[in-house]
């Protein structure tokens, strides 16, 4: 017979999905945020996004070229990192500083740890934190290019002491200050719908993260308006949809995803409500990224008929 059995080590591919197709879906889901940022902040938003993407792809290509490794840029993961990092900075961010964040994200966080699938934290997330710590003044310029916008709208909603002054419609549509990707909740929701519809991500993490934050704020403030304003403000929605759901740095079981989402809500609420820092999403995500291996271990599904080693040893000793 001419039939040959090809035996290879697991895992065996049982799906037509590839890294490239998954990343392509994420890019499509990010498009509403990119378009909304251009409408709200002007065409410079597109320049910031383009520079970030080109820098990430270039750094990945150059690193692999110098170390004579296979070129992975066709999987589009560097493009996703570039867009997400661009959506995490203000429109006036100096491009040179942004490129430093791209360098940290791609070379230090991603490639030095072995490339895609090996990073301990979300590359774009760490890049944002490095930019925030290193260039705080640039990262905190919450202004519209249009000088006609009033001061309340041009400030980030998290900086407004009286949340009753915040319009929920303005928060949902993005008529307020903030970084490029976090302002328009409508665009983020459209991206979420696409990702869930294409089964690129599970709704478990965004729902448990945002839902727990809403409940915590509702209990703390006794106000539905304040709780909704907290959910629609800052980087919560963008982080919950595009960063907390990262395949590498999030749990793989449903139970683990729910635990992860609620834990993110607890940490973010604690930082925002009791801490001196008005945001909290980035640091909460980084903190919980470190706990993902333990969450995976604790929530791992036990195969039917599995006997724990301690119990097996005890039974063997009794014979």
Enumerate the language-model features and the residues they cover.
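N-terminal signal-anchor module of multipass membrane proteins
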Residues: 1-53, 57, 315-319
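Alpha-helical transmembrane segments in multi-pass membrane proteins
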Residues: 25-33, 48-60, 77-82, 86, ...
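Structural signature of hydrophobic alpha-helical transmembrane segments
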Residues: 42-55, 92-101, 171, 175-185, ...
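C-terminal ends of transmembrane helices
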Residues: 58-70, 106-118, 188-198, 241-250
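Membrane-interface helix-loop-helix junctions at boundaries between adjacent transmembrane segments
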Residues: 77-78, 83-149
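Long hydrophobic alpha-helical segments that form multi-pass transmembrane helix bundles
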Residues: 117-189
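Loop-to-transmembrane alpha-helix initiation sites
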Residues: 120, 124, 206, 228-236, ...
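Conserved mixed alpha/beta catalytic, RNA-binding, or beta-rich assembly cores of soluble enzyme
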Residues: 196-223
């Amino acid at each position: 017979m001419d039939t040959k059995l090809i035996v290879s080590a697991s895992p065996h591919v049982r799906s037509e999905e590839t890294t490239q197709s998954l990343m392509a879906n994420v890019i499509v889901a990010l498009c509403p945020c990119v378009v909304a940022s251009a409408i709200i902040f002007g065409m410079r938003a597109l320049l910031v996004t383009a520079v970030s993407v080109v820098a990430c792809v270039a750094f990945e290509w150059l690193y692999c070229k110098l170390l004579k490794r296979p070129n992975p840029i066709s999987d589009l993961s560097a493009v996703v990192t570039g867009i997400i990092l661009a959506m995490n900075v203000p429109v006036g961010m100096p491009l040179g500083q942004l490129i430093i964040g791209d360098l940290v994200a791609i070379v230090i966080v991603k490639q030095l740890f072995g490339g895609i699938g090996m990073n301990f934290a979300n590359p774009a997330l760490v890049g944002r934190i490095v930019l925030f710590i290193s260039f705080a003044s640039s990262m905190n310029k919450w202004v519209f290019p249009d000088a006609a916008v009033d001061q309340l709208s041009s400030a980030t909603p998290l900086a407004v002491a009286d949340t009753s002054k915040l319009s929920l419609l303005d928060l949902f549509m993005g008529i307020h200050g903030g970084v490029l990707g976090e302002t328009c909740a409508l665009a983020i929701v459209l991206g979420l719908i696409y990702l869930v519809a294409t089964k690129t991500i599970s709704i478990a993490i965004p729902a448990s993260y945002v839902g727990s934050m809403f409940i915590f704020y509702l209990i703390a403030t006794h106000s539905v308006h304040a709780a909704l304003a907290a959910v629609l403000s800052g980087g919560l929605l963008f982080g919950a949809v595009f960063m907390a759901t990262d395949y590498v740095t999030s749990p793989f079981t449903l139970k683990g995803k729910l635990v992860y989402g609620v834990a993110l809500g607890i940490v973010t609420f604690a930082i925002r409500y009791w801490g001196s820092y008005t945001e909290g999403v980035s640091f909460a995500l980084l903190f919980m990224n470190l706990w993902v291996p333990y969450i995976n271990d604790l929530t791992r599904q036990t195969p039917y008929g599995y006997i724990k080693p301690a119990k097996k040893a005890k039974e063997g000793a009794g014979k």
